[in-house]
C-alpha cells in the first residue's frame, strides 16, 4: 500500500513537470532509509529548481504532499497504479526462468542488510493477485495520512555559492512548513480520458512478400505500403515483444542553417500530444522519435 501511494504521488509530480513553465525542474517522493541511517525509515519529497525559483518549488511539493494527505487519491488514479503494479509483477513472474544474476544478488543483499523477505516470485505473484484487488483506495489514503506528518521534519537545502543568489532563511522555511495545513487546496482532478487513441481503426494492408533467413536469422516482410519489416525471434525474454520503426532522412535533409531549429523537432513532437490526447494523458505511453541521416 505504501509503494502504491508513493507511485501515485510521483505521477502527480510528473504531471506538474509537463506544464509550460513548471515550478520545478524535477521532483520526486519516496520512502526509505533516512539518508544513511539503516535503522530509520522516513517519507521524503524533494525538488530541484532553477535559480530564483527555490521558494516556489518548495511550496509546490509541500502543496502536493498536503493535497495527498488531505484529500487522498482518486479511484481512477488507483486503478491505473494498481494495474501497472500487477503488470510488473506478472512480467517478473513470466520471466522467472530468465532472471539475471543481479536480481538474485540484490534480493540476497536486501535480505541480509534490511531483513527484507524473499519468498520468491511465484509466491509474490499469487499473493499480490489475491490481495491487491481487495485493497480499496480508502486504505491507501489512510496510509498517506499517517505517512505525511507535520512534526519531526527535516529540510535540507543545497545549491551553489553565487553572488547575488539568495536562499530562504531557516525562519522562512519553518513558516512555510507551518502553513501546510492551511494551504488553500482543491482535490486532485484526474483528467485522463478513456476514449481510444484512434477513433477508427485504420484499414489494414497486406504482406506482398516474405523471405526467411534474410539478415542474422531474421524474416523479411514487405508490406503493401512499402514498409519493410524484419522479424527475429529470440529466447532472451519469455514474454516480451520489442518494436522499433525508422524512416530514413531526418535532419540531413535540411539546410545547415536550420540545424538549431531541426534539433528541437523530436522534443516538440513529444510534448505536442496526439489527437485529443495531450502530453499528460500520454505519460504512460511515450513514443521516442529520433532522427536518422542519409547522404544527399
Regions found by a protein language model. Name each.
Residues 6-48, 107:
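A structural supersecondary motif
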Residues 284-295:
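Single conserved hydrophobic/aromatic residue that forms the stacking wall/gate
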Residues 1-2, 7-14, 18-20, 79-83, ...:
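Proteolytic maturation boundary segments
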Residues 22-29, 67-105, 128, 152-160, ...:
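Acidic/histidine-enriched alpha-helical segments
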Residues 42-51, 65-72, 126-131, 247-255, ...:
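Second-shell loop/turn segments in exported
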Residues 35-41, 121, 221, 261:
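Short, flexible turn/loop "capping" segments at secondary-structure junctions
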Residues 259-267:
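Active-site recognition of the HExxH zinc-binding catalytic motif
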Residues 5, 53-60, 64, 74-81, ...:
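Stable alpha-helical elements in mature extracytoplasmic
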Amino acid at each position: 500500500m505504501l509503494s502504491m501511494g508513493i507511485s501515485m504521488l510521483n505521477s502527480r509530480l510528473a504531471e506538474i513537470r509537463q506544464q509550460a513553465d513548471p515550478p520545478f525542474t524535477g521532483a520526486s517522493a519516496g520512502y526509505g532509509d533516512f539518508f544513511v541511517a539503516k535503522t530509520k525509515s522516513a517519507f521524503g519529497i524533494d525538488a530541484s529548481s532553477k535559480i530564483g525559483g527555490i521558494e516556489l518549488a518548495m511550496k509546490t511539493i509541500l502543496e502536493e504532499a498536503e493535497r495527498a494527505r488531505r484529500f487522498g487519491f482518486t479511484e481512477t488514479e488507483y486503478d491505473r497504479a494498481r494495474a501497472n503494479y500487477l503488470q510488473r509483477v506478472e512480467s517478473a513472474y513470466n520471466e522467472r526462468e530468465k532472471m539475471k544474476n543481479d536480481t538474485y544478488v540484490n534480493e540476497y543483499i536486501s535480505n541480509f542488510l534490511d531483513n527484507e523477505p524473499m519468498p520468491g516470485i511465484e509466491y509474490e505473484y499469487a499473493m499480490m493477485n489475491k490481495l491487491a484487488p481487495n485493497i480499496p483506495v480508502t486504505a491507501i489514503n489512510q496510509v498517506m495520512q499517517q505517512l505525511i506528518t507535520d512534526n519531526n521534519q527535516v529540510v535540507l537545502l543545497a545549491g551553489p555559492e553565487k553572488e547575488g543568489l539568495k536562499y530562504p532563511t531557516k525562519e522562512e522555511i519553518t513558516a512555510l512548513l507551518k502553513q501546510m495545513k492551511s494551504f488553500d487546496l482543491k482535490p486532485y482532478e484526474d483528467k485522463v480520458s478513456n476514449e481510444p487513441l484512434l477513433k477508427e481503426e485504420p484499414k489494414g494492408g497486406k504482406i506482398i512478400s516474405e523471405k526467411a533467413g534474410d539478415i542474422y536469422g531474421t524474416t523479411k516482410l514487405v508490406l503493401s505500403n512499402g514498409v519493410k519489416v524484419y522479424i527475429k525471434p529470440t529466447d532472451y525474454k519469455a514474454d516480451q515483444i520489442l518494436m522499433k520503426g525508422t524512416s530514413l532522412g531526418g535532419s540531413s535533409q535540411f539546410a545547415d542553417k536550420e540545424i538549431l531549429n531541426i534539433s528541437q523537432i523530436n522534443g516538440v513532437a513529444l510534448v505536442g500530444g496526439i489527437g485529443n490526447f495531450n502530453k499528460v494523458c500520454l505519460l504512460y505511453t511515450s513514443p521516442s522519435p529520433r532522427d536518422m541521416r542519409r547522404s544527399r
